[in-house]
Amino acid sequence: MPEVWLGYGDSEIILDIKYENILRILRPEIKVISPENLRLNIHNNINLQNSTLVLITTPFPKMLDILKIINQLSHELDIELPDVFVLSKPFMLRLRQDISKESLSIARIEPDELIKKISQYRNVILIDKIQYDPVFGFAASPTKLIRECYPQVMNQIYATTLDELPKPGLSGEALKITMETLSELNCQMIHVYSDREVIDSIYFGHDINSFLESVKSFKEKTSTTSDFSKSAFISSNTTYTSQLNLGNSLNLLWNNYHSVLEGGTIVLLSENRGGVNEGAISKFVEGRLDLNGLDKYQYINEIEHIKFLQLLRDKYEIILISTLPQIYLNKLGLKSVSKIKDGLDLIFTKNGKYSKSNIIPVSEITMVKNNPA
């Protein structure tokens, strides 16, 4: 049997599956940029000076390599080290441990403090990891800023997505609105294509529109093709928050649910030690969200997941491997099992012991394109 390891929270678990039951393992090829080339790229493309703010909009493991190089270059230039902030809720244990291990000084900042903080510095550098996103098409610094700091813009974007299916990998109206809103933002940008272990590519820009070129290259590198499958296993753990809460995990689902035939089964690894995020999902499971009024609401955090579930949960059997109480998942129309083997057994019961599944280990950096049925 092959060893297929899938991310589950901060760890990995093995999917004990035979070769003959695997249609394809769908993941992008990730090349490794050498430490020397990484340093050279940062040296040649980033302006460092006194009064510099470095903002990480999504914490991810390989950000630490970039921050160490920025600090080294600052020492060589004999300038003050930049102030580094992460746009984050209280740091997860793994993130705190990794920061401590590297002896880096990184502080946390809340969204309501951020815009004022940016105005206090002469030089601002935004850093993030590019991922797929079912609302914006792609996620990184620009979209994270809109989600966290521009509620009125999110209302506008939400109004354009009503009754629409997830659109990962498409540069549509939501991304257009994002670019227009942030067009006057004066900053440098570093966007990264990486998994948990290595960096493949690093993209630089000196205005917000550079993000569009970054995601174009990212999509070319991370798209893969496959036949439709009757079932799939979807997971990821390439950021510190990939499966932190249910909303994070559902993003993984929406990015590649389309690789499965309607009526098929999707097993989603969704540890969710952070539970259900404060927002639309928690309001719904507590009976405080009227589904008949979704088109009348202003944007509530993660309301897109309620909308997508309404559109898709009757078309697929969605099974979660999760620590969340089943009573929560029942209200969302989702099933759960305690072990990944139980998910595989349910697929065999439904489709037969010779059925084949697609396996998508890093769904936030994978775009599956289906061959014609």
Question: Which residues are covered by each model-predicted region?
Answer:
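Short glycine-rich or small-residue beta-strand-to-loop segments that form or flank ligand, phosphate
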Residues: 50-64, 85-88, 233-235
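C-terminal non-catalytic interaction/assembly regions of soluble proteins
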Residues: 249-250, 254-373
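N-terminal amphipathic/basic leader segments beginning at the initiator methionine
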Residues: 1-37
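Histidine-anchored nucleotide/phosphate-binding helix
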Residues: 59-80, 249-260, 266
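Short acidic-hydrophobic, aromatic-tinged amphipathic segments that line or gate anion-handling sites
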Residues: 30-38, 102-110, 206-210, 334-343
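Well-ordered mid-protein domain cores that form the structural environment of catalytic cofactors
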Residues: 63-113
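Glycine-rich phosphate/diphosphate-binding loops that line cofactor/substrate pockets in enzymes
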Residues: 38-55, 75-80, 224-231, 259-262, ...
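Conserved, well-structured core segments that form the ligand-binding/active-site neighborhood
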Residues: 102-236
